[in-house]
Amino acid sequence: MIELSTVSKVFHQGRPNEFRALREVSLTLARGGVTVFKGPSGSGKTTLLTLIGALARPTSGRITLNGRLLSNLPERFLTDVRRHTFGFVFQQFNLLRGLTVLENVMLPAYPLGRPYRQLVSAAQALLEQFGLGEKAANQVEWLSGGEAQRTALARALINNPTVIIADEPTAHLDSARSREVLALLGELAAQDRTVFISSHDPLVFEAVSVNRLIELQDGRIVADSPC
């Protein structure tokens, strides 16, 4: 379970261009299911996901994971929690050009020191699961948008995380590919993982796999409802 208590995030604090991205957000996120954070650009949904996923620290407030306070952990401990707990799918995919599909999937696992052969086997199995087995040796720049998105999903799973965070996962996809990705995320939730999605895509809000919809506006939660 993840809990946020009066969490705020301020960028450029004390400067003329100060920006309050989140304003005293309190939230309890239970394990399992698919939770979608919706809102227009600048509403704070992506910032909220970066805090939940321990990619950034709040300016004020507390964040706990299964009762453990994360918001004041030293960076090396926070990094360890992030690597073992969370898998990330970024809006721009963040695949490294010049590397193969297989090499991209393996990247997040290198710091954990797994044996190389074991890592290759795990990455190949994930690519097979996502219908990309035959693309393993291809350079990522040759992939279609849908293939790149599935590669990003496979990479997010390489460390077997319990929580998947997807920022605008359908942003660059047509309706058919969007439904495919949402189905894959739903399958992950069915495997006892927790899935958090930020989006302003109606296809995401209406997906049958979504259990909870949280709406943000100007850095505040303005609606929170089960689906």
Question: Which residues does each PLM region occupy?
Answer:
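ABC ATPase NBD coupling module
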Residues: 19, 70-87, 190
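The feature captures the beta-strand-to-loop junction immediately N-terminal to the Walker
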Residues: 38-40
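Helix-to-loop junction immediately C-terminal to a conserved catalytic motif
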Residues: 53
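Conserved ABC transporter NBD signature motif
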Residues: 61-69
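Conserved signature/switch motifs of ABC ATPase nucleotide-binding domains
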Residues: 138, 159, 191
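Conserved ABC ATPase signature
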Residues: 139-143, 147-149
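Catalytic Walker B motif of ABC-type/P-loop ATPase nucleotide-binding domains
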Residues: 164-167
